[in-house]
Curated annotation (Swiss-Prot):
Gene Ontology cellular component terms for the protein in this record: DNA-directed RNA polymerase complex
UniProt: Zn(2+) 2 binding residues: C808, C882, C889, C892
Class of enzymatic activity (EC top level): transferase
Name this polypeptide is given: DNA-directed RNA polymerase subunit beta'
Lineage: Bacteria, Pseudomonadati, Thermodesulfobacteriota, Desulfuromonadia, Geobacterales
Keyword hit for Protease: no
Summary of the function given for this chain in its UniProt record: DNA-dependent RNA polymerase catalyzes the transcription of DNA into RNA using the four ribonucleoside triphosphates as substrates.
The protein's Enzyme Commission number: 2.7.7.6
Assembly and binders: The RNAP catalytic core consists of 2 alpha, 1 beta, 1 beta' and 1 omega subunit. When a sigma factor is associated with the core the holoenzyme is formed, which can initiate transcription.
C-alpha cells in the first residue's frame, strides 16, 4: 500500500511558494525549458489521427496522446513507465504532460518582441533613444541603423533611410557598420553598457534645462535602472527562438463529419513555422537580398501576430474573416484568462431554480426542492446508504437512488440535517448577496425563500432565480454556518443598522394593529393585566385599536406595575417582545422606521438569538394582521384637494404677471424662466401639502355629537405613512398634480402637468410625460452597467486593505463635528462617531470628567453621554491616519458594523467598503433628480427664518447699513449664529454677499422670525460708500453692449469681453469733491465688473452705501444642477479635475489686484510675513473676493468647483479626505442612502497611498518617481542612518483606476486593466509579487490572506485540555455512586 501511495506524484500544495516573479526569458532559458524543436507546420495525420513527428502536436516532444502508451504501440501499460520507445522516440508516461511540456522554434533571424516594441512607451525605443516610428522602419526593413560607428564620429544608433545610408557609405568609405531588421537592433542592445548609461543619464538629468528634457531623461533612466536591478539583458527583448505552448492548451478537436475545430494559436504557429522554414531555405540558396528581406519582414509580422494580433497593422484573419485570437487576447478583457477562469469559476455541486416566498419558514431555513437535494447530496447519500447496509457497492447505491426508493428519501432527510446550503442571487453586489440556510425538503420545483431576507438579496418573487451551492468539506460547513448563516447577518455591513426588517405586508399589518382609533368599542376601559386584554379581545368586547389603559409590569427591572395608555393591538404585540426590550419601544404607531429601530434595540439589549426569534414572530404577526385588516384601495381613496383649482389659477395669474414684467423689461429671460419654474414648484408643493393633510385627517362625530379631526384610516395614506409601499411623491401624482417634467437633457419644461392620474392626463400632458418616463428606463439600463463598473474599480483598489494588527500606536486622528447644511444639522455628531475609537480622553466641557478614555470604542451609551454633554468636536482614530505598513489596524477602523463589536483581525475591510459604496450605486440616478421623470426642484431659498429662539451673534460679518436701516452684508465668509442662554450655538448660517440682515447683534428673536433675505437668481455687486457714479472703460461697442430684448424692446447695459486687453470696465464712486471716494486707508471705491454683469445704475446717479450697482445673473437652473448621482461619485473617486475649477489661494493674506497680464486678471495675495503670491484668473470669470479682503489658505478666488488635487496641495490630506467624504456622502444622502464614513475613508486611504519624489537627496530614488509611501520612508531612514540627505516627496492623489494599476502586485494590476502594458513593465523590472492582496491569491489558487485564511490560522493544532476535577465534584461522585 505504501508503495502505491508513493508511486503517484503528489498534487502540489498551494502553500509551497510564497511569492511569484516575472521576468524576460533569455533564449537559453527558452531552449532549456523546451522538450524539443518543432520543425514542421503539420499537426496530425488526417487518416490515422496520430500526431505528425516534429510537428505542432508531436508526441516525441510533448508526450504521448494516450496514457502510458507510445505512438507506435510497442510499449503499453504502467509496467513500461519511463521507457523511451526506440522506434518512435516517445516516452511512456501519462498523457497529461501534454498540458505542461513546452516546445520551441529556432528562428532563422532574430525577431523583436511586439510587447517591448509597441506597448507604450516603447521599451526598446526608450532604451536606445529612438522614436517608435524610426524603430519600426528599421525592424520592418525600411531603414538602416548604425550598429558600430567605429571612428567616424557618428552618433550610436542613428537611423538612416536607404538613400542616406548609401550617401554615408560613400562619404566614410564604409568605415562604419549599419544594418536593418531585428538583428541590427539586437547588436545595438548588446553593445550597450547600462552602468555607464545610467551614470550619464543621471548627470544629464541634473544638467537638464527644460522640464520636458528632464522628464524624458527620467523615463529613460527608469527603464535602464529596471534592467540593471532585475538582471534582465536588453537584447532578450529580441527573440532568437520562440516557445511553443503545450498542445493540450491549444487543442485540435475532431468534429463529426471529419472536420476539426482548432484553436487559433495553431494557425498562428503554422504561419511562423512556414515562414521560418522558407527563410532558412532561401538563405541556404543565397537568394537575392530583396527576397530575403521580404521574408524576414514577413517572419517578424507572423511572430507579432502570434504574440499580439492586431497590435500593428491589420489583424490577421482566419478563413471566416474573424481576427485570430493571439496569446495576448487569451489574457485580456472579460473573457480572458484572468477574469474568466481565474477570478470567476463555475462551480460544481450547485443548482438554480425560481424562488417563491416561504412565509412559514424560520429565519435560518430555506425550502429546497427534493429533486434538487437528491442531485446535490448524491455522494453523501451513497455513503449513508452504504453505512446503513442498504447497499454494498457504489454502483448499486447509484441504481437505488435513480429508482428513488423510499429508503433513499429517509436517508436524504438524515444527510440534509445540520448541513447548511448557500443561496445566491445574481447580481451579488455585496456580501449579503450570498447567505447560508438550513434546507427543508419541499415538494415542487421552486426554492422557498424567507421573506425577511429579500431586502438583503434584493429579491422579489416575480420570476427571480437563485442559485444553491453546497459546501462539502467540514471546514467549509463550519465557516458557512458561523459566518454566512442568515441569522448571523442581521446588521448591514454598510451602515450597521438592521437589514432584516419586516417590509410591505408585514409592516402594514403591524402598523394597522398599533394604530389608535378614536371612539372605538371599549374606548377608555382599564385592564388589570396583559392577559385580561387578550380575553376581552377574544370575546370581542374591545376593539383592536381602542384607546385603553393597562396595568403593566416592566419586565427588565422589578419596578411596580404602572398604568399605561395604549391599545389592545400594542398589548398583543408586546406578547412577542423579549423581556429586555421596554414596552415604550412599541407603544406608538409602528411604521417601518420604528420597526427597524425595534430590531436594532432588541439586538443591542437582548442579543442575537432573541432578535432572530423576534424577527420571525414579527413576520408571522405582521402577515396575520395584514390579512385581518384586509386593506384595499379604490379610486375614491385618492382624494383630490378642493383648493387645487384655486391654487392652479393663482399660479397661472402669477406666471402672467412675470411674463408682463419680462415684456416691460424689468427682468431678463433667464430670470423669467427661473421664476416661472419656482412658481409652479411652489404650487405643486402647496397642492401636495393640502392633499396629504386631507388624506391624513378624517372628521368623525364624537359620542357627544361634536365633530373631531382624527388621524385617517385612508388605505393609501396608511400604506405610505407606514412605509409599506408608495411615497408622498407618488401619492402626489395620484391625487395632487404631476407637476413639472424634465426633458432628457435635464432642463425643466416650464409648462407643468396640472392633472393627476386620477383625473387622467390630456394627450399633450401624456406626451410630455412619456418623455421623462422613457428617459428613466434608458437611464436604468445604463446605470446598472456603470454602477457595476464603479464597484469593480473600488474592489480592485481596496482589495488589499485588510485588518492586519490590533493597534498601530498612532497619535494622529481626525476631528469630527456634526454635519450642518444651511444651518440645519443633517447628521449629529453621535451618528458620526458611533463605533469609532477615541484618540484622546474625551472630557465633559463643564465638569471636566473623562467621558471616554483614549483608545476606547465609543458605543451607544457613550454616544449618549457625549451628546448630552453638548460636545461639538471629538477627536477619533481613523483609517486615514492609521500607521500600519500593510493593511489597517483594528483600533483605527473601529467597530465591525455587521457584528456590532470591534473589528476582528483579518477582516477584509477594503472589499466591504467597496461593496458598501458600490451596492447602492444602482439606486443612485445618472442625473440628480427624477421620479418617473417628474422634476423635483425645490423652490430656491430666498430668506432665512430662525428655527429656535435665542440671541443673534455675528461671526466675521462686514456690513453697511442702508437707508431702510437694514444691514447689507459686504463679505463672503460671514456667518450668523443664534445662541441660547448658556452661550451654546443652536444654529449657524452662512450669510451670502449682498444679503439683507433684518436683525441686530444681541437682539433676542423668536422662532420663525425672519433673519435675512437675498435674491437667489443674481449675484449683486454693491457699493460700500455713498457718492456719485462714474463709469471707467465702459465704452459702448467695446466693453459694454446695450442688449435690446426682442420681446420687450427694452435695453440693458451688459459688460462684454473687449478685444482690447487693457480695458478694465469698472464703476467708480466719487465724493463731493469729485475725487474717488476712499473706503478705508488702503481701498478705493472702485468696482471692477466681470463679463456678463448687468449695470443697474446710470452714470452720475447718486448712490447710498449698500446699493446694488450691478448684477451678475446666475445660470438658468437645470435639473442637473450639479453632476449628480453616479457620475459625481465616479468623478470624486477618480480624482478628476472638474471642468471649470476654481483657483484657490495657497496662503493666508490680504487681496489686492494687479495689472492684467495676457488677458487674465491678476490677483495678489499678500501675507503678513513673507512673499506675496500672484494668481492669474481668466477674464470673464467672476472673482469672488474683493480688494482688501482677508483670505485663508485654500479659499477660492473665483467661482467654480473645487479641484481635489489643489485641496491636497494646499490644505493637506485630512482636509482632502474630509472634502471627499462629505461630497460623496452628499450624493448618497440625496437618495436617502446611508453609508458609514469609514468606508469612504478606507477608499480614500487607498487613493493616497503613494507619494511623488520632488527632490532625491542622497537616495537611489528618481525625481518624479511615484511610489508607495512606506518604500519612500524606508529609503529615507536608510539614508539618514548613514548621515545622508533624505529625499523630499509630496503626497499624491490617484484616482481609483490609476491606484489599482499602480499596486505593488502585478498580478492584481494585470487582471484589472491594460493587461499587456502591466505585464510588459513588470517583466522588465523583474517584479516579485509577494501575494499580499486577495486578488493575487485567488488567481494563484491559494487561500486568501484574510479571515480564516490568515497565515496564523493555517497550521493550528487542536489540543484537548484535560478537565480539572475539583475535590467537591469527586465527593459528589462518591455520594452518587
Amino acid at each position: 500500500m505504501e508503495d502505491i501511495f508513493n508511486f503517484f506524484d503528489k498534487p502540489k500544495d498551494p502553500l509551497h511558494f510564497s511569492a511569484i516573479r516575472i521576468s524576460v526569458s533569455s533564449p537559453e532559458k527558452i531552449r532549456e525549458r523546451s522538450f524539443g524543436e518543432v520543425k514542421k507546420p503539420e499537426t496530425i495525420n488526417y487518416r490515422t489521427f496520430k500526431p505528425e513527428r516534429d510537428g505542432l502536436f508531436c508526441a516525441k516532444i510533448f508526450g504521448p496522446t494516450k496514457d502510458y502508451e507510445c505512438n507506435c504501440g510497442k510499449y503499453k501499460r504502467m509496467k513500461h513507465r519511463g521507457i523511451v520507445c526506440e522506434k518512435c522516440g516517445v516516452e511512456v508516461i501519462p498523457s497529461k504532460v501534454r498540458r505542461e511540456r513546452l516546445g520551441h522554434i529556432d528562428l532563422a533571424t532574430p525577431v523583436a518582441h511586439i510587447w517591448f516594441l509597441k506597448s507604450l512607451p516603447s521599451r526598446i525605443g526608450n532604451l536606445m533613444d529612438i522614436t517608435l516610428k524610426d524603430l519600426e522602419k528599421v525592424l520592418y526593413f525600411e531603414a538602416y541603423v548604425v550598429t558600430d560607428p567605429k571612428n567616424t564620429g557618428m552618433p550610436f544608433a542613428q537611423v538612416f533611410s536607404e538613400d542616406q545610408y548609401l550617401k554615408a557609405m560613400e562619404e566614410y568609405n564604409g568605415q562604419f557598420e549599419a544594418g536593418m531588421g531585428a538583428a541590427a537592433i539586437r547588436e545595438c542592445l548588446m553593445s550597450m553598457d547600462l552602468d555607464v548609461l545610467a551614470e550619464q543619464l543621471r548627470v544629464e538629468m541634473l544638467e537638464a534645462t527644460s522640464e520636458a528634457k528632464r522628464k524624458k531623461t527620467a523615463k529613460r533612466l527608469k527603464v535602464v535602472e529596471a534592467f540593471k536591478s532585475s538582471g534582465n539583458k536588453p537584447e532578450w527583448m529580441i527573440l532568437e527562438c520562440i516557445p511553443v505552448l503545450p498542445p493540450e492548451l491549444r487543442p485540435l478537436v475532431p468534429l463529426d463529419g471529419g472536420r476539426f475545430a482548432t484553436s487559433d494559436l495553431n494557425d498562428l504557429y503554422r504561419r511562423v513555422i512556414n515562414r521560418n522554414n522558407r527563410l532558412k531555405r532561401l538563405m541556404e540558396l543565397q537568394a537575392p537580398e530583396v527576397i530575403i528581406r521580404n521574408e524576414k519582414r514577413m517572419l517578424q509580422e507572423a511572430v507579432d501576430a502570434l504574440f499580439d494580433n492586431g497590435r500593428r497593422g491589420r489583424a490577421i484573419a482566419g478563413p471566416n474573416k474573424r481576427p485570430l485570437k493571439s496569446l495576448s487576447d487569451m489574457l485580456k478583457g472579460k473573457s480572458g484568462r484572468f477574469r474568466q477562469n481565474l477570478l470567476g469559476k463555475r462551480v460544481d455541486y450547485s443548482g438554480r431554480s425560481v424562488i417563491v416566498v416561504g412565509p412559514e419558514l424560520r429565519l435560518h431555513q430555506c425550502g429546497l426542492p427534493k429533486k434538487m437535494a437528491l442531485e446535490l447530496f448524491k455522494p453523501f447519500i451513497y455513503n449513508k446508504l452504504e453505512e446503513k447496509g442498504f447497499v454494498t457497492t457504489i454502483k448499486s447505491a447509484k441504481k437505488m437512488v435513480e429508482k428513488e426508493r423510499p429508503e433513499v428519501w429517509d436517508v436524504l432527510e438524515e444527510v440534509i440535517k445540520e448541513h447548511p446550503v448557500m443561496l445566491n442571487r445574481a447580481p451579488t453586489l455585496h456580501r449579503l448577496g450570498i447567505q447560508a440556510f438550513e434546507p427543508v425538503l419541499i415538494e415542487g420545483k421552486a426554492i422557498q425563500l424567507h421573506p425577511l431576507v429579500c431586502t438583503a438579496f434584493n429579491a422579489d418573487f416575480d420570476g427571480d432565480q437563485m442559485a444553491v451551492h453546497l459546501p462539502l468539506s467540514v471546514e467549509s460547513q463550519v465557516e458557512t454556518r458561523v459566518l454566512m448563516m442568515s441569522t448571523n447577518n442581521i446588521l448591514s455591513p454598510a451602515h450597521g443598522k438592521p437589514i432584516i426588517v419586516p417590509s410591505q405586508d408585514m409592516v402594514l399589518g403591524i402598523y394597522y394593529m398599533t394604530r389608535e382609533k378614536f371612539f372605538a368599542k371599549g374606548d377608555g376601559k382599564i385592564f388589570a393585566s396583559q392577559d385580561e386584554v387578550r380575553i376581552a379581545l377574544d370575546a370581542d368586547e374591545v376593539d383592536l385599536q381602542a384607546r385603553v389603559k393597562v396595568r403593566l409590569k416592566n419586565l427588565a427591572t422589578d419596578e411596580k406595575p404602572q398604568l399605561v395608555d395604549t391599545t389592545p393591538g400594542r398589548v398583543v404585540l408586546r406578547e412577542i417582545l423579549p423581556d429586555e426590550v421596554p414596552f415604550a419601544t412599541i407603544n406608538k404607531v409602528m411604521t417601518k422606521k420604528e420597526l427597524s429601530n425595534l430590531v436594532d434595540v432588541c439586538y443591542r439589549l437582548a442579543g442575537n438569538k432573541e432578535t432572530v426569534i423576534l424577527a420571525d414572530k414579527l413576520k408571522s404577526i405582521g402577515f396575520r394582521y395584514s390579512t385581518i385588516a384586509g386593506i384595499s384601495i379604490s379610486i375614491n381613496d385618492m382624494v383630490i384637494p378642493e383648493g387645487k383649482t384655486a391654487i392652479i389659477n393663482r399660479a397661472s395669474e402669477d406666471v402672467k404677471e412675470i411674463q408682463n414684467q419680462y415684456t416691460e423689461g424689468l427682468i431678463t429671460d433667464g430670470e423669467r424662466y427661473n421664476k416661472v419654474i419656482d412658481i409652479w414648484a411652489k404650487s405643486t408643493e402647496e397642492i401636495a401639502k393640502e392633499m396629504l393633510d386631507n388624506l391624513s385627517r378624517d372628521i368623525v362625530h364624537a359620542p357627544d355629537g361634536k365633530e373631531v379631526k382624527v388621524p385617517s384610516f385612508n388605505a393609501i395614506h396608511m400604506m405610505a405613512d407606514s412605509g409599506a409601499r408608495g411615497s408622498a411623491q407618488q401619492i402626489r401624482q395620484l391625487a395632487g398634480m404631476r407637476g413639472l417634467m424634465a426633458k432628457p437633457s435635464g432642463e425643466i419644461i416650464e409648462t407643468p402637468i396640472t392633472a393627476n392620474f386620477r383625473e387622467g392626463l390630456t394627450v399633450l400632458q401624456y406626451f410630455i410625460s412619456t418623455h421623462g418616463a422613457r428617459k428613466g428606463l434608458a437611464d436604468t439600463a445604463l446605470k446598472t452597467a456603470n454602477s457595476g463598473y464603479l464597484t469593480r474599480r473600488l474592489v480592485d483598489v481596496a482589495q488589499d486593505a485588510i485588518i492586519t494588527e490590533p493597534d498601530c500606536g498612532t497619535l494622529d486622528g481626525l476631528v469630527v463635528s456634526s454635519l450642518t447644511e444651511g444651518g440645519e444639522i443633517i447628521e449629529h455628531i453621535g451618528d458620526r462617531i458611533l463605533g469609532r475609537v477615541a484618540l484622546d480622553d474625551i472630557l465633559d466641557p463643564v465638569t471636566g470628567d473623562v467621558l471616554v478614555a483614549s483608545n476606547e470604542e465609543i458605543d451607544e451609551t457613550l454616544v449618549q453621554k457625549i451628546e448630552s454633554a453638548g460636545l461639538e468636536k471629538v477627536k477619533i482614530r481613523s483609517v486615514l491616519t492609521c500607521q500600519s505598513r500593510r493593511g489597517i489596524c483594528a483600533k483605527c477602523y473601529g467597530r465591525d458594523l455587521a457584528r456590532g463589536h470591534l473589528v476582528n483581525m483579518g477582516e477584509a475591510v477594503g472589499v466591504i467598503a467597496a461593496q458598501s459604496i458600490g451596492e447602492p450605486g444602482t439606486q443612485l440616478t445618472m442625473r440628480t433628480f427624477h421620479i418617473g421623470g417628474t422634476a423635483s426642484r425645490r423652490a430656491e431659498q430666498t430668506s432665512l427664518e430662525a428655527r429656535t429662539e435665542g440671541s443673534v451673534k455675528f461671526i466675521n460679518i462686514n456690513y453697511v447699513t442702508n437707508t431702510d436701516g437694514h444691514h447689507i452684508v459686504m463679505n463672503r465668509n460671514g456667518e450668523l449664529a443664534i445662541v441660547d442662554e448658556t452661550g451654546r450655538e443652536r444654529e449657524k448660517y452662512s450669510i451670502l454677499y449682498g444679503a439683507k440682515i433684518k436683525v441686530n447683534v444681541g437682539q433676542v428673536i423668536k422662532q420663525g422670525e425672519a433673519i435675512a433675505e437675498w435674491d437667489p437668481y443674481t449675484m449683486p455687486i454693491l457699493t460700500e460708500i455713498a457718492g456719485k457714479v462714474k463709469f471707467g472703460d465702459i465704452i459702448e461697442g467695446v466693453s459694454m453692449e446695450e442688449q435690446v430684448d426682442e420681446v420687450t424692446g427694452l435695453s440693458r447695459k451688459v459688460v462684454v469681453e473687449s478685444r482690447d486687453a487693457d480695458k478694465r470696465p469698472r464703476i467708480t464712486i466719487k465724493d463731493e469733491a469729485g475725487k474717488t471716494a476712499k473706503i478705508n486707508e488702503t481701498t478705493m471705491g472702485r468696482y471692477y465688473l466681470p463679463v456678463g454683469a448687468n449695470i443697474t445704475v446710470q452714470e452720475d446717479a447718486v448712490v447710498n452705501a449698500g446699493d446694488v450697482i450691478a448684477k451678475i445673473p446666475r445660470e438658468t437652473t437645470k435639473t442637473k444642477d450639479i453632476t449628480g448621482g453616479l457620475p459625481r461619485v465616479a468623478e470624486l473617486f477618480e480624482a478628476r479635475k472638474p471642468k471649470d475649477f476654481a483657483v484657490i489661494t495657497e496662503i493666508d493674506g490680504i487681496v489686492t489686484f494687479g495689472k492684467d497680464a495676457k488677458g487674465k486678471r491678476k490677483v495678489i495675495v499678500t501675507p503678513e510675513m513673507g512673499e506675496p503670491k500672484e494668481y492669474l484668473i481668466p477674464k470673464g470669470k467672476h472673482i469672488s473676493v474683493h480688494e482688501g479682503d482677508h483670505v485663508r489658505a485654500g479659499e477660492a478666488l473665483m467661482d467654480g468647483s473645487s479641484n481635489p488635487h489643489d485641496i491636497l496641495r494646499v490644505l493637506g490630506q485630512k482636509e482632502l479626505a474630509k472634502y471627499l467624504v462629505d461630497e460623496v456622502q452628499e450624493v448618497y444622502r440625496l437618495q436617502g442612502v446611508k453609508i458609514n464614513d469609514k468606508h469612504i475613508e478606507t477608499i480614500v486611504r487607498q487613493m493616497l497611498r503613494r507619494v511623488r519624489i520632488k527632490d532625491v537627496g542622497d537616495t537611489t530614488l528618481l525625481i518624479d518617481d511615484q511610489l508607495e509611501r512606506y518604500i519612500f520612508e524606508d529609503e529615507n531612514e536608510r539614508v539618514l542612518d548613514k548621515g545622508g540627505k533624505p529625499a523630499i516627496a509630496e503626497p499624491l492623489l490617484l484616482g481609483i483606476t490609476k491606484a489599482s494599476l499602480s499596486t505593488e502586485s502585478f498580478i492584481s494590476a494585470a487582471s484589472f486593466q491594460e493587461t499587456t502594458k502591466v505585464l510588459t513593465q513588470a517583466s522588465i523590472e523583474g517584479k516579485i509579487d509577494g501575494l499580499r492582496g486577495l486578488k493575487e491569491n485567488v488567481i494563484m489558487g491559494r487561500l486568501i490572506p484574510a479571515g480564516t485564511g490568515l497565515a496564523r490560522y493555517r497550521n493550528l493544532k487542536l489540543v484537548a485540555e484535560e478537565p480539572v476535577v475539583t475535590p467537591s465534584e469527586q465527593v459528589e461522585e462518591v455520594a452518587a455512586g
